[in-house]
């Protein structure tokens, strides 16, 4: 019996693939590792989505690392639980930036995504969401 990939896992993997492309273009970070932030609800009502993104990112980054990483650098995930809350998402994002992330995968729901997007612009941080789908996520008012 052939196992089908779920839409959720496909979207999680797609987000990680896109972030890896951004990292390749940016050249990564200094040192031997490139830190990638993964942000989403890991607990609470919509935790299944956040956990899927972390699982997809972990799997993909493991595969990239097994093939030598990006430009010879290994990828490291820093995942944080924003508990489905926009304020907590911004707090987690700031903590991840303090830990040296180079790019962000997530958030997974619209309200936290929009809150973090405003902050990521201030940090000039590439951000990819696999599942936030409201028009405001892709619309730039400027």
Model-derived features with residue positions:
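Short, low-complexity disordered leader/linker segments with a strong preference
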Residues: 1-35, 66
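Short coil-to-beta-strand
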Residues: 30-37, 126-130
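Extracytoplasmic "Venus flytrap"
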Residues: 37-56, 80-86, 108-111
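Extracytoplasmic/secreted envelope proteins and their assembly/folding machinery
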Residues: 54, 58-61, 90-93, 113-121
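Signal peptide-proximal N-terminal region
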Residues: 55-77
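Structural motif
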Residues: 74-98
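Extracytoplasmic ligand/sensor domains, especially the bilobed periplasmic-binding protein
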Residues: 101-142
């Amino acid at each position: 019996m052939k196992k089908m990939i779920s839409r959720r896992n496909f979207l999680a993997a797609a987000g990680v693939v896109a972030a890896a492309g951004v990292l390749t273009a940016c050249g990564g970070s200094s040192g031997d590792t490139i830190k990638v932030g993964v942000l989403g609800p890991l607990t609470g009502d919509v935790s299944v989505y956040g956990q899927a993104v972390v699982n997809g990112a972990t799997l993909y980054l493991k595969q990239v690392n097994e093939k030598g990483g990006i430009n010879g650098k290994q990828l490291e995930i820093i995942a944080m639980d924003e508990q489905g809350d926009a304020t907590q998402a911004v707090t987690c994002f700031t903590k991840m930036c303090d830990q040296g992330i180079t790019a962000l995968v997530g958030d997974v729901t619209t309200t936290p995504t929009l809150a973090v997007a405003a902050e990521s612009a201030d940090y000039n941080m590439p951000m990819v969401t696999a599942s936030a789908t409201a028009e405001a996520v892709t619309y730039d008012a400027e």
